[in-house]
């Protein structure tokens, strides 16, 4: 499976035969604002995931060594996610694990880097490393890309409001 798509400013690269994928997205906001939107639970729940999803935080300790957990709900049910923040470098980098409670044996590692593009713009580059090629391909097939696109569009609107 080789996928390299650009939907609504999200670039998703899914290299064939690897356990990883790359996501790149530019935002019209400074790195500190994009970082805060990822670390502040009150902001995170407003933009994370597809349009029809609502999120509830169960645990949120946004620091190196801290844990996080939330539940996403839609008309079809609820979906729990959890992980640990392995590295939090303010306005620069977030390294965390990510586990969907429906597949507890499939732990992913996410590495997010924020790059200041100047003029109040930020590039968010994210690498997600899955436990297997099959897990990665399953997440992509389940609609991961549309969730990312819709979530980042909601984040754009939130940042435009001054968050």
Spans of features found by a protein language model:
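Beta-strand/loop substructures that line and gate deep hydrophobic ligand-binding cavities in soluble
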Residues: 20, 95-149
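Hydrophobic ligand-binding cavity/cleft-lining segments
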Residues: 1-54
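A short, structured loop/turn motif at beta-sheet edges
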Residues: 31-32, 63, 86-92, 114-123
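Intrinsic-disorder/low-complexity, polar/charged segments enriched in Ser/Thr/Lys/Arg/Asp/Glu/Gln
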Residues: 18-24, 55, 67, 80, ...
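Short beta-edge strand/loop motif at the mouth of beta-sheet-based domains
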Residues: 22-23, 42-78
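Hydrophobic/aromatic beta-strand elements that line small-molecule binding cavities or substrate pockets
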Residues: 24-25, 57-60, 81-87, 98, ...
């Amino acid at each position: 499976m080789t996928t390299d798509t650009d939907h609504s400013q999200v670039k998703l690269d899914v290299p064939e035969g690897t356990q990883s994928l790359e996501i790149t997205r530019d935002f019209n906001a400074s790195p500190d604002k994009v970082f805060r939107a990822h670390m502040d639970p009150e902001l995170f729940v407003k933009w994370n995931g597809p349009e029809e999803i609502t999120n509830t935080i169960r645990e949120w300790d946004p620091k190196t060594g801290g844990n996080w957990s939330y539940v996403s709900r839609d008309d079809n049910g609820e979906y729990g996610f959890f992980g640990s923040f392995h590295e939090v470098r303010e306005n620069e980098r977030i390294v965390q694990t990510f586990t969907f409670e429906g597949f507890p044996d499939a732990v992913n590692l996410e590495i997010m880097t924020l790059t200041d593009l100047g003029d109040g713009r930020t590039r968010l580059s994210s690498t997600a490393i899955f436990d297997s090629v099959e897990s990665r391909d399953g997440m992509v097939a389940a609609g991961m890309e549309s969730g990312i696109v819709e979530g980042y569009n909601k984040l754009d609107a939130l940042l435009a409001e001054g968050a």
